[in-house]
Amino acid sequence: MTEIFSDTGFRQLTQMFLAIIFFHTSEYILAIAIHGASKVTLSSLLISKHYALAMLISVLEYIAEIVFFPGLKQHWWISNFGLTMIILGEILRKTAIITAGRSFTHLIKIRREEHHKLVTEGVYQIMRHPSYSGFLIWSVGTQVMLCNPISAIAFAVVVWRFFAERIPYEEHYLKQFFGRQYVEYAQRVPSGVPFVN
């Protein structure tokens, strides 16, 4: 059990918790900066029961593996690759949020508001849903950084499936809001989530 307190355990778990704290805090701060404190609730922290359970399971996997298979956690090139994924996913997501400005919300809007505009510049020139792509990269990266093979696969599948269902739902409303303009945009720019058109 002392393996958890080894240099490896300390480094990887510290990086994991710092990544989680930074991600959620920055999401909340950006929401306040863009929309104003009066329009932002704690839901902008993006912490749900399912998410918390997934993170708990990943930590339990980490503890079990570092105790019974400590060598599994010593693959630094894998861990560093995961850390790189976390950073790149974070940059992509935050760039998407800042670029979209007031048009970005954590909840899918089903009614068009006055300030809504179709954002097609910046990172939106290369993908329609860069914030989703960024979160997918970030979330899988947390598990790759921990050298958690089971959770890395599970996170990839679950997060991908979530976005595979969310994107068509969201785009239904985007087509209503922006009509032909959005249809043409969607035809020439990929979603940013693999295998989701």
UniProtKB/Swiss-Prot annotation:
Q: Which GO terms describe its molecular function?
A: protein C-terminal S-isoprenylcysteine carboxyl O-methyltransferase activity
Which keywords does the record carry?
A: Endoplasmic reticulum, Membrane, Methyltransferase, S-adenosyl-L-methionine, Transferase, Transmembrane, Transmembrane helix
**What does the record note about the induction of this protein?**
Not induced by abscisic acid or auxin.
Report which gene this protein is encoded by.
ICMTB
- Phenotype of the disrupted gene, per the record: Plants lacking ICMTA and ICMTB have altered phyllotaxis, fasciated stems and development of axillary flowers.
Q: How does it sit in the membrane?
A: Multi-pass membrane protein
Where do the TM regions start and end? 16-36, 52-72, 81-101, 140-160
Tissue expression remark: Expressed in flowers, stems, leaves, roots and siliques. Detected in apices and vascular tissues of leaves and roots, in the stigma and in the filaments and anthers of stamen. Not found in petioles or hypocotyls.
EC number(s) per entry: 2.1.1.100
Q: What's the further remark here?
A: ICMTB is more widely expressed and has a higher catalytic activity than ICMTA.
Cofactor dependence is on: Zn(2+)
* Source superkingdom: Eukaryota
The cofactor note from the UniProt entry for this protein is: Divalent metal cations. Probably Zn(2+).
Q: Name one GO cellular component term.
A: endoplasmic reticulum
Catalytic activity as recorded in UniProt:
[protein]-C-terminal S-[(2E,6E)-farnesyl]-L-cysteine + S-adenosyl-L-methionine = [protein]-C-terminal S-[(2E,6E)-farnesyl]-L-cysteine methyl ester + S-adenosyl-L-homocysteine
Query: What is the designated name of this protein?
Result: Protein-S-isoprenylcysteine O-methyltransferase B
Question: What controls its activity?
Answer: Inhibited by farnesylthioacetic acid (FTAA) and N-acetyl-S-trans, trans-farnesyl-l-cysteine (AFC).
